[in-house]
Swiss-Prot record:
Residues 411-581 form the tr-type G domain. It comes from Chlorobaculum tepidum (strain ATCC 49652 / DSM 12025 / NBRC 103806 / TLS) (Chlorobium tepidum). Residues 557-559 are annotated as: G5. Residues 420-427 are annotated as: G1. One of its GO terms (cellular component) is cytoplasm. Residues 246-271, 293-313 are annotated as: Disordered. This is Translation initiation factor IF-2. Residues 445-449 are annotated as: G2. Residues 521-524 are annotated as: G4. It is found in: Cytoplasm. Residues 249-266 have a biased composition (Basic and acidic residues). One of its GO terms (molecular function) is GTP binding. Belongs to the TRAFAC class translation factor GTPase superfamily. Classic translation factor GTPase family. IF-2 subfamily. PROSITE patterns: G_TR_2, IF2.
Amino acid sequence: MAIEEKQSRFRISDIAKELQVSPREVLQFVKQAGGKVASTSSMVGEDMRDMIFGNFSQEKKRVDEARKIRAEKQKRLTRLEEQSRKAYEKEQQLKESLSIAPLPAPVLHAPEVKIEIPPETATTPVAAEPPAILPVVSTPQPEPVADLPLVTEPVVAEPVAEAEPVVEAPVAETAGPEVMTPLVQTLPESMQAYEAPQKIGGLTVLGTIDVISEAERKKKSRKKSFRESAVELKGEFENVLSVDSEDGEAAKKKAAKPDGGEDVGVKKKKGKKKKKVEIDDKVISKNIKSTISGMDDSGLSGSRQKFRKQRRMEREREFEEAEAMREAEKTLIRVTEYASPHELAELMGLTAKEIIQKCFSMGKFVTINQRLDKETIELIGLEFGFEVEFISEIEATTTEELVDNAEDLQTRPPVVTIMGHVDHGKTSLLDYIRRSNVVAGESGGITQHIGAYEVSLDDGRHITFLDTPGHEAFTAMRARGAQVTDIVILVVAADDSVMPQTIEAINHAKAAGVPIVVAINKIDKPEANVEKIKAQLSEAGVLVEDWGGESQCQEISAKKGIGISELLEKVLAEAEIRELKGNYSRDILASGVIVESELDKGKGVVSTVLVQRGFLKVGDPFVAGNSMGKVRALMDERGKRIHEAGPSTPVRVLGFEDMPQSGDVLTVMASDRDARDLAQKRQIIKREHEFRRSTRVKLDSIARQIKEGLKKELSVIIKADTDGSIQALADGLMKIHNEEVKVQIIHQGVGQITETDVLLAAASDAIIIGFRVRPNVNAKRLAEKEDLDVRFYSVIYHVLEDVEKALEGMLSPELHEESLGSLEIRQVFRVPKVGNVGGAYVLEGKVSRDAKVRLLRDGVQIFEGQLDSLKRFKDDVKEVDAGYECGVSLKGYDDIKVGDVIEAYKIVEKKRKL
């Protein structure tokens, strides 16, 4: 019973496939019909299957009809193939009988039959006769001399009157040849279609066509009788040739020789006496194939013809598009915004005078080196018939790409990006792989920066990992990660589900054309449901191998280390399939991508670079975006110094003059001078753009506000600890706007909040957002004096949520922090069994023992927690006022340094204002 029941159940996706409809439609119908199903992989009974077929009856009918048509076409095709095979066999038999038949043929009667034709062509008997002479006269030139008298005697007896009885007598005497002659005559008629293509090559045929065309032009009235006599003559002449010359070569010579004849009369008639053509198997099979392909019944060949025609049309269309593109390229100029007339003239192949004259005619008075705005450049381009495309200063000064030599290419480690939703265990997975605690320093388990790490496996192979931040605010950063990556590990928690961010990660990977390896995490939890995750992934467009797809899948537990080694094996297998190559030549100039940049107090600007080509070495001059520098030191992700870094190696680079942006390409230059020139060129263009923009924006915005009814702008200044966070914040904030208010970022930068930022905010009526950074003491006092709104965050999507709610007018009271006081560490003491204790001086306010504190180093937040102890001399105290010294230690944190500032605060509920 159980077996029968199992056999009578059907999967929804299979039924949908059979009906050729969407599985979702079938699933929807089953749910409406009261079926208890979860997904398209659920099973239904036979009754439900019949109901589905009933509902989708039209689709089923269509599918059945299509199936019937296919079967009918197949049957017809088989029948046609059988017919063609039989026809081929029949032709083979005819060919064999043809080769046997002429052996007992009479030699003497053939010329007499040829003389039969003149009575029909009564007007020109002389023209009809010479062909009888031609082959015979020309034959004596080869070896057989015996043939000459045989044919010459009838030629001497030329009178036409005598010719008729001569024909009748021999036919009556020999009844045998009569039987043979019709056979030889009928065969050429049946085989005429097959012989025709073969005749084109010979000289005889060319002569024949010319003669016939002449005859057609001169004597149209006798065209039919002439053709009939030619067919008869051809049959008889073939009979003679096959008997006269036993080997084929002699026959060929006889037939081919008359072309070189001297006599004009001979030339006229020579075409009628054709040699016997040997029937070729290839010709027969070719003709059969062409006949079959020409038949309308043949569905297969018809569809093939249709496909060929379609393909040809596509090729023609592609060619036309390519031509159009080439034409458009000729009229396309790529220029930076605010280019001068002189630069435009060079790009358009004109003189600067023509550009300036055109500007005058448009009512604009310009000089040769004056910068033109975007609209003016577009107008000038249109006037001269050019299409204008605006590019950035970096694109305008990009160094030429060099082609890699095949001998320099070697297999390189794969660059793997770990993607997935917030808190699904991406960093925990990388943490287990690296066997070091990365997670501890991250805020609330959320990765804030792109980290690049190289992992060495036990067998000596390497993998480079990019750990991208998980939240939607980091779309831009994650997109950057996908651009440099080879393989994506998509982490999905088995106790959760496929979230919007997971789908977003899938879309990024697909857009970048990167293969996905699915890692289903947290399988050690009791509520884990792996099959549900696979089903949801299939709906999101990722079909795992277990379900017949291409994406590899591995069940893992990042905490316990289950399945990690298998996951890495699958990643390496995917990398082997991709055949990843890198240029390992030491003669070329290296290049790489800036993954992340930050400002370090002792080291200056430090950037994480993923090397893509060549070897990056200490001392190399380079350009990255608008900044240049010289490699002062290279370090791996653990801070260990190295001398060089090859392809797919992440490395921290010291030696930048300015802060580069994440995603900038780092290019090593031949000399310091080249690097400086290129960087300066880019900086000039950028400064020009910024200057132009800042001088224009105010006037334009006033005009626009008047037009749109005072559309307000929320001005924002962003300060953060790294460039990647700034980019993500800026991108997120620019997307937030409603009909009344829009967000405008007037300034952004890396580092602590300074007095300059506060003054700019006061002048522009802006708010300041500090992401993992704090203001210095003077900036804080100035902000309080100016009554500015300065906000501090450590998680990006909290910023976006607050701004969005503020714009929607949905601000609820918030938990606001109130500063109590701050103290500065002036000396550090090491106390046994306790750890580091700071000797501190209270700068302002009052520091109490139970207050929450944060440790700031160079304005950047390092630690947030509580005081462990607060002492004056040897006594524990509850609070210390400004101007007094005290000893402090922090709960759970020991890394206190001289110069650190500890800020005490409390959380109070406050009405929001933004």
